[in-house]
Amino acid sequence: MSNVISVGMADLKTTKAPNILMTAGLGSCIGICVHDPIQKVGGMAHIMLPTAGSAPGGNPAKYADTAMDLLVTEILRLGASKSRLRAKMAGGAQMFSFPGKPPVLKIGDRNAEQVIVELKRLGIPLLVSDVGGSFGRTIHFDVGTGDLKVRTINHGEKVI
């Protein structure tokens, strides 16, 4: 019997199969899911911003550049092999329109780009993503199968 484990904003959790990780309220935030398909362990981070920048020492789960290292460390503690880790992500929407404003305000795009940078640095392949648009998402990640269910209002539900 699987348990659904909720991951809050600026939070990360790891678990073993048959558990499912869930986060809601992904607008410009990114839900990044990493798992080892052989050991059937994985984790999810709900990342709010691309880099810690001038806020070092804060909550590492809040930022892509610090959350990814922590997420991988915690997954490895559950018995995963770094060489088998795979990732999927969702979110990164542009929830509000800022015509004529600088790219710095496109937080969703910047979050997705930074997660990709961190995955490349860590040598973890990104298998699939569902990012962008102007709508929020709720995701459920099955760490046993690696299935990521993405649910949206007015845009349906899909498994990636």
Curated annotation (Swiss-Prot):
GO molecular function per UniProt: protein-glutamine glutaminase activity
EC code(s) of this entry: 3.5.1.44
Keyword Transcription attributed: no
UniProt signal peptide: none
InterPro entries noted in UniProt: CheD-like_sf (IPR038592), Chemorcpt_Glu_NH3ase_CheD (IPR005659), Cytotoxic_necrot_fac-like_cat (IPR011324)
Alphabetical keyword list: Chemotaxis, Hydrolase
Catalytic activity, reaction form: L-glutaminyl-[protein] + H2O = L-glutamyl-[protein] + NH4(+)
GO BP annotation list: chemotaxis
Record has Amino-acid biosynthesis as a keyword: no
Function in brief: Probably deamidates glutamine residues to glutamate on methyl-accepting chemotaxis receptors (MCPs), playing an important role in chemotaxis.
HAMAP family: CheD
Family as reported in the entry's similarity comment: Belongs to the CheD family.
Name of the molecule in the record: Probable chemoreceptor glutamine deamidase CheD
